[in-house]
């Protein structure tokens, strides 16, 4: 066990990030289990502890008697300095065991700009970065999460990649590891990887060869062995009603980003927003019943003492039994001062009655996501809402006592013009004027938050070349010039960070050396504006003979092989191409959840179904139309 000396620990910010011992944390004697796992998250404690996936994995592994999972997060700059000064290796929170002593180190990957933190954590742990330099004396490196659907830029660092939902997959892998470990890994590391590659949803990068053309374009990625699958199909949980859910999560000692109980209403989203990668990755929609959700809420509140429950899914307001669930939660917790919160809502799903109910305990502003300023642009991205929808929702809100509205938009979308940007300012002014008209007061406020569009894999825009950073900055200045009212605040994201994110989002294996060079030059916590160094990143690319524009700004041909083609989210390329063509013509595609099948291919490919409770009972939609 690593000893933490208070003589120096008191000099770092928030030492509770590193001490462990939180309520509901689980400590096991490593000598009594067969498999030890460190769950890594490449960001600071407050961000990592807010992530539901970590909570699920932590509870999932620790419910087994033969395994233990402990947590490890990226140390903040001051803590890293102290650790390096004192030769303290990266350690787990629960038992302060050096990370290199675990059997498995499993990272959750949410964001491309956290990749250098992975390298920094490996270096602090004394673990070689490249998989080829590690034998079984070191932990097996595993990763999962949305970035796994194009893991190629970091594939050289990882041994095993989990594609899809990991509850069943994790148990299968632990069982195999336990059995092979007991036999002494007779086939060595490669032999074990060939066996684990047989588990559906498993990608082992070392078992594949990558080929490029003479011009330097990606050509193919092929398995090195006949028993290794050419493509890896994602795993899903069909029965989300009864799947494991963490009702006894670790309660942190310090404030974290999302410090509350979380209810996952359903998985998947079929709204079909064309910019949205998550809506493609997590199909099909599978709901939990209100009764199951109420029980989860009761257990979690009893086990944690939280005073807030967040209703979380990709589009929470689309939950078919939302009014009933809210009534059940409010009745259960009405005398316990436990509030219920909803994230940003789709405008067409908004119910002022629900909003009023959930804010009986604590009242806050309302958040909507029109995404674009004009109807043409909203149709292009398949948002499927109108200005009338937004103004009607705001009218109801203002009449019911709300004074604050936050609006989310995106900038740099395909076919976007300055007229579309002007529409953002126009909408903000209309909402503000509406408040004054309804209330007769001038205390209304509108927050306009505009992000820089990053094309992502497995979406209809995966072929689209991102707009030039200087053009984005021009657009940001233009929009700012149109907003001149102290009651409208305007926030926008840095274009340079989005540029690097796009390069890694659509990158190939050659980018691993760029990451190493950038890390050597001091890059880490790149998702934090104050630590991102654009010039250092450009130099890292140049030193490796690569250009970020090749990955971020280049529009691909439909027939061009893509570095992530072998990582199958089961949404067909034909469907994505059809959606691109629909976007160019500004045509809408309906939601297959309550309309005819749109032919994305997920349900028949996975032999599964949409699970919805709209009609009162469980409805499994299993008919398919388009191919």
Describe the role of every protein-language-model region.
Residues 7-38, 45-46, 205, 211-262, ...:
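N-terminal [4Fe-4S]-dependent radical SAM core
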Residues 39-42, 113, 299-406, 410-447, ...:
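Conserved SAM/AdoMet-binding glycine-rich loop
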Residues 51, 255-291, 599-616:
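Canonical Radical SAM [4Fe-4S] cluster-binding loop centered on the CxxxCxxC motif
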Residues 74-222, 460-508, 516-531:
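Glycine-rich beta-alpha loop elements in corrinoid/cobalamin-binding modules
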Residues 276, 556-626:
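Cysteine-cluster motifs in flexible loop/terminal segments that predominantly coordinate metals
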């Amino acid at each position: 066990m690593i000893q933490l000396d208070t003589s120096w620990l008191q000099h770092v910010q928030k030492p509770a990030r590193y001490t462990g011992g939180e309520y509901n944390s689980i400590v096991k004697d490593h000598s009594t289990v067969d498999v030890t796992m460190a769950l890594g998250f490449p960001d600071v404690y407050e961000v990592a502890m807010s992530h539901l996936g970590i909570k699920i994995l932590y509870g999932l592994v620790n419910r087994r008697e033969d395994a233990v999972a402990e947590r490890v997060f990226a140390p903040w700059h001051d803590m890293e300095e102290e650790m390096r000064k004192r030769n303290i290796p990266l350690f787990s929170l629960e038992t302060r065991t050096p990370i290199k002593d675990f059997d498995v180190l499993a990272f959750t990957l949410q964001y491309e700009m956290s990749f250098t933190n992975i390298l920094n954590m490996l270096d602090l742990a004394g673990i070689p970065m490249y998989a080829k330099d590690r034998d079984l004396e070191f932990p097996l490196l595993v990763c999962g999460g949305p970035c796994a659907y194009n893991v190629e830029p970091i594939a050289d660092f990882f041994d095993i990649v989990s594609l899809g939902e990991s509850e069943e997959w994790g148990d299968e892998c632990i069982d195999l590891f336990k059995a092979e470990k007991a036999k002494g890994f007779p086939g060595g590391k490669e032999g074990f990887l060939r066996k684990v590659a047989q588990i559906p949803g498993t990608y082992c990068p070392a078992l594949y060869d990558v080929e490029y053309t003479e011009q330097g374009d990606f050509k193919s990625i092929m398995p090195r062995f006949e028993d290794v699958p050419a493509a890896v199909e994602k795993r899903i949980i069909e029965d989300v009603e009864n799947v494991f859910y963490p009702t006894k999560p670790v309660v942190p000692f310090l404030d974290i980003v999302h410090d509350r109980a979380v209810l996952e209403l359903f998985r998947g989203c079929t709204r079909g927003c064309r910019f949205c990668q998550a809506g493609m990755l997590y199909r099909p929609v599978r709901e939990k019943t209100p009764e199951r959700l109420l029980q989860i809420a009761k257990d979690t509140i009893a086990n944690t003492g939280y005073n807030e429950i967040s209703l979380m899914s990709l589009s929470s307001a689309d939950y078919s039994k939302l009014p009933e669930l809210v009534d059940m939660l409010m009745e259960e917790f009405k005398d316990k001062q436990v509030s219920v919160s909803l994230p940003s809502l789709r405008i067409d799903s908004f119910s002022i009655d629900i909003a009023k109910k959930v804010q009986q305990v604590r009242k806050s502003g309302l958040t909507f996501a029109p995404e674009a300023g004009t109807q043409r642009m909203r149709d292009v991205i398949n948002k499927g809402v109108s200005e009338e929808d937004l103004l009607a929702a705001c009218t109801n809100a203002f009449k019911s006592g709300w004074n604050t509205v936050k609006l989310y938009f995106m900038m740099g979308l395909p076919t976007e013009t300055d007229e579309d940007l002007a529409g953002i300012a126009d909408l903000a002014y209309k909402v503000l004027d509406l408040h004054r008209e309804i209330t007769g007061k001038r205390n209304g406020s509108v927050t306009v938050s505009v992000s820089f569009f990053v094309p992502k894999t497995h979406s209809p825009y995966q072929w689209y070349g991102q707009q030039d950073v200087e053009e984005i900055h021009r657009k940001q200045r233009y929009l700012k010039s149109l907003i001149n009212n102290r009651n409208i605040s305007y926030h926008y994201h840095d274009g340079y960070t989005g540029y690097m994110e796009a390069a890694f989002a659509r990158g190939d294996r050659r980018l691993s050396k760029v990451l190493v060079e950038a890390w050597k030059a001091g890059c880490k916590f790149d998702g934090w504006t104050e630590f991102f160094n654009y010039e250092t990143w450009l130099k890292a690319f140049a030193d490796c003979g690569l250009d970020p524009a090749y990955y971020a700004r280049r529009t691909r041909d439909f027939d061009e092989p893509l570095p992530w083609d072998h990582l199958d989210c089961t949404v067909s390329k034909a469907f994505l191409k059809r959606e691109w063509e629909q976007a160019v013509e500004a045509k809408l595609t309906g939601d297959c959840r309550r309309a005819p099948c749109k032919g994305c291919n997920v349900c028949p490919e996975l032999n599964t179904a949409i699970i919805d409770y709209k009609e009162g009972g469980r409805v499994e939609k299993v008919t398919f139309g388009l191919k």
